[in-house]
């Protein structure tokens, strides 16, 4: 009797429930405006060492999650800049065409010329979301270039899984 019960449990575990975990690759392009908020505090140990707190609004021109186009993203981050390099860490809240949201955490490095950003790279990971993006997980990379007017362009790559 126990053997039949265990076999029945195994068969039930294999039955399709109608909700499947979706996997995919994210490859997109994003353009960010000049930071809306940018608070700078000199550290005082050297003339070029500063800490900043910034927020920037970004628009995606390419990219989707499970067929839902990525529209925009607001990133809030801190930077520790000194010696031509900035170490950055922050969070992003993005909106899909459906209105669902995703949340990310990122950290990276920005190359500076003086105090002006030139290029950057980062690693990011999903930390959650709403609607279809609820329970999303995954990670990836980003590479950015900065323009003289403080706008920036980003190439985003990664992989994700959505919850069943």
Which residues does each PLM region occupy?
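Bacterial N-terminal signal peptides that target proteins for export
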Residues: 1-7
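N-terminal signal peptide c-region/cleavage motif recognized by signal peptidases
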Residues: 15-19
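Beta-strand-enriched cores of mature, soluble protein domains
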Residues: 21-164
């Amino acid at each position: 009797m126990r053997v039949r019960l265990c076999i029945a449990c195994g068969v039930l575990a294999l039955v399709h429930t109608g909700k499947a975990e979706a996997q995919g690759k994210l490859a997109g392009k994003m353009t960010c405006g000049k930071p809306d908020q940018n608070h700078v505090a000199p550290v005082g140990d050297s003339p070029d060492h500063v800490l900043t707190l910034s927020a920037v609004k970004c628009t995606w021109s390419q990219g989707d999650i499970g067929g839902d186009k990525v529209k925009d993203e607001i990133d809030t981050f801190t930077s520790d800049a000194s010696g031509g390099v900035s170490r950055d860490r922050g969070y992003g809240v993005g909106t899909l065409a459906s209105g669902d949201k995703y949340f990310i955490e990122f950290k990276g490095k920005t190359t500076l010329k003086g105090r002006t950003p030139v290029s950057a790279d980062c690693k990011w990971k999903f930390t959650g979301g709403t609607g279809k993006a609820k329970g999303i997980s995954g990670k990836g990379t980003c590479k950015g270039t900065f323009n003289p007017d403080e706008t920036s362009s980003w190439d985003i790559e990664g992989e994700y899984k959505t919850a069943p």
